[in-house]
Structures are given as C-alpha cells and as structure tokens.
Amino acid sequence: MANEVSIYEPRTMGRVVQKLPPVRTFFRSTFFRHEETFTTKDVDVDFRKGSRKVAPFVSRLVGGKVVPNTGYQTKTYTPPLVAPEKVTTVDDLLIRRPGESLYSGRTPAERAVLKMADDFKELREQILRREELMCAQTIFTGAIPIIGDGVNEVIDFSFTNKETISVAKNKWTADTSDPIADIKRWHETVQKKGFVNCDICVMGSDVANAFVNHPKVQKMLDVKNFNLAVIQPKQLPNGVTYIGTIHELGLDIYKYNEWYLDDWTNPDAPEDKPLVPANSLALLSTNADYSMYYGAITLIKEQDGNFVTVEGKYVPDTWTKRKPARRFLNLSSAPLCVPHDVDSWFVATPI
C-alpha cells in the first residue's frame, strides 16, 4: 500500500509554490535578473570601481611597469525578512468557495488543496510586489527603507548620480528648456563614471507628458528627423508604455504606470503610491551589473521542534493551533536587490 503524502509536507508545498504563475515586474525582470541564494542570513556584496587608466610608456631598457590592481569594496548586508501568512479555519473548508457551484460535491480536503494553492499564490505575489518596490527604491533613491513591525532602518547604497532641475526656465514644463540636451548630458555622465551606455529611460507620468509635448522634442521628432528620434507609443504589460526611441543615443523611452499600496507609513489611511515618482526619470543600462540576493530562512520543524535553516528564494511553512482550530500558511523570503556599480544609472527630476 502506498504511503499517503500530506499536502502540508514542505516538499509538497514547495512544489506548489514553484508551479505558481509568476507576477511580471518591469524593474526586477529587466535589470535585476541575476539571482543568487545564500545559506546564511547575511550576504557579502562586492562593489567595484573601475578606471580609465592608460597603459604607461616605458624604456626598452627598463622593461615593464607594475600596474596596481583595481580595487573593490565589500559590504555586508542582512537582507530584510518578509513573511506574509494566511490562516485557514474550519469554516473555510466547510463552506462553498468563491465561484464554486452551489451544488458542488467538493470535500473539505479538496477545498484545503485549492485554498492552499490560492493562498500561496497571493503570498508570493505580495513578496514579488515588495521586490519590485525595493528595486524601484534602489533605482530612484539609492536606498531601501526597511519599515515594519519591530524594524525601522535604511539600506543605503551611497548613490550620487542624480540631479534636480530647480531653475524655472530649465524645467521641462518651460519652452525655454531643452529635454534632449539634458538627456544627452546625463547619458554622457553615466558613460564617463559608470562605463556603460544607458539604453533605457524610464519616466514618471508627468515627466513623460512634459517630454512628449515639449516643442523642441516635437520638432526633433519631425518626419524628416526620423534618423534622430521617433515617438511610437505602445502599451506593454504591467503598466509599461513604450514611448519612443532616441536613435542618436540608442535610448528607448518608457513610461511606467504602476502603483503599490503603502499601508505602513500611515496605517489608518493606506494610500496607493506610484513606483516611479511622477516628476522623475531614470536612465539605465540593461548591461549593468544588478543582482537579486536571497538570505537563508530559519524555521522550526513542527515534528521535533528543532531549528532548520533553508536556502531558497521563497520558503513555505505551516503549523496548527487549537481552540479555535486553525492552520497557518507562511511564505518567507529575505530578498535584497543589489546594484554592484552605483554609477551605472542616473536619476533626474526635470519638472
């Protein structure tokens, strides 16, 4: 007789989590594609700083000259823990599920399987939204505020490639400004300091409107100047709109309309906020070095009460409590988005 496998065994829950459809996220999937998991709660991050040193001339009688190694800086971070959980009660298993037929013959055990899959899907989507928010905060502020129950700190990457246009006549809302010249200047700054060519520009909604409607931009986008730039708005998934391309720079321009629910700044008045500040833009390179790191998760085995440390992106766990009877489903993750070269992108506030 075959042994029965509980749906709440870690290996079974792990397979459920792995089979769930992913949530598409623009920043995370476009830039922070490299993933690495660790067996420790702390991770070491190497930050490299290159140079444009030229090979030295030497006399044929002297021979070679030693060139110093390019240095790097290692910092240790503790990836923040995110651990949303759901509760299943007896009522959840005995009553009809949303969308279930009034005359359904499903058993409580069958409903338990469906609810577990739905719960893990919801929990993983919440974690992925958190990862996307962390990526956006890293890009636009160079820091990740860690605010939650029992935690209030900031992970700061010492980002300095940013500029706010404060002079009224130079703001993109003024006809006297020159958005194309500004973008060229910021693009060159990243080339000089970050050693990469920015190929994507992500604009907030207000910046995108000011850019597209600016007379100098529209003049440049005249049909006769097709080789310089083109505007061809096109809707893409998950709030991303392709605006056009500045061919001269090889720079694709996007508007990213995506929001998240901020229910921790003021818990009494949760607010939907944009991932991309409406008055900001970022110039980025898909060839720059970004990573998603995941610290280890430590759980307690319900069978014997011993601690166990698990390496993985998303670690499921479950336990029960009595009076009233409840089962808890938890999905834990310790993500950290890492920009290995903080000079490889530029952020501006042009309006």
Locations of regions flagged by a protein language model:
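Long, contiguous amphipathic alpha-helices that act as assembly "spine/axial" helices in icosahedral shell
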Residues: P84-S158, D178, D182, E188-N209, ...
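Sequence/fold signature of self-assembling virion shell proteins
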Residues: Q218-I351
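N-terminal alpha-helical "arm" segments
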Residues: M1-D44, V338-I351
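Short alpha-helical segments and helix-capping/turn motifs at coil-helix boundaries
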Residues: R28-F31, K184-E188, K313-V315
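Structured, charged N-terminal subsegments at the starts of enzyme catalytic cores
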Residues: V151-K171
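A short, structural micro-pattern
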Residues: T37-T39, F195, K323
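Assembly/oligomerization interface modules of large self-assembling protein complexes
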Residues: H34-L102
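Acidic/histidine-enriched, beta-strand-rich ligand/metal-binding domains
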Residues: K171-C201, D206, V212-H214, Q218-L221, ...
